[in-house]
UniProtKB/Swiss-Prot annotation:
Keyword Isomerase: no
Gene name per UniProt: kdpC
Protein name: Potassium-transporting ATPase KdpC subunit
PANTHER family: POTASSIUM-TRANSPORTING ATPASE C CHAIN, POTASSIUM-TRANSPORTING ATPASE KDPC SUBUNIT
Keywords from the UniProt entry: ATP-binding, Cell membrane, Ion transport, Membrane, Nucleotide-binding, Potassium, Potassium transport, Transmembrane, Transmembrane helix, Transport
Amino acid sequence: MNTIRNSICLTIITMVLCGFLFPLAITLIGQIFFYQQANGSLITYDNRIVGSKLIGQHWTDTRYFHGRPSAVDYNMNPEKLYKNGVSSGGSNESNGNTELIARVKHHVKFGNSNVTIDAATSSGSGLDPHITVENALKQAPRIADARHISTSRVTDLIQHRMQRGVLTNDYVNVLELNIALDKMKY
């Protein structure tokens, strides 16, 4: 009988610690010390939320930098999510998979071998908000032409927004870069 009582007490203590006190402590720490990150790292522009630093978006306008391809087509629409059931994830296809090869060829624009790997392949999450600096620099002439500004102004903006990778290539956040483009004076 003593063993059962001890087991029940230990179970209740564990449930209170792990189910209430620990989550409460972590939530409080997040809200006090990491408020921006704990609430989605949302980016505001012109007094409205335009996205998150953590989630990529699909860009098609030639005046903007384009992010990485998404294996889930940046599926953040609740109605699409209900139909498709997938909101993030990689393709999980092998290098020899014909669908993957066709998709990479499509992103490479029919045989242009002068493209960075992140411009042709999706990330593991399918929602990567960053591109490499090399990818951004290759897009700079297109953006400069579309905005009627010099390529050097666009490359200066890229260099200013560059984040250093520790074990990876240097990268830039596409949404922040595109907002900075819109804020530029022509």
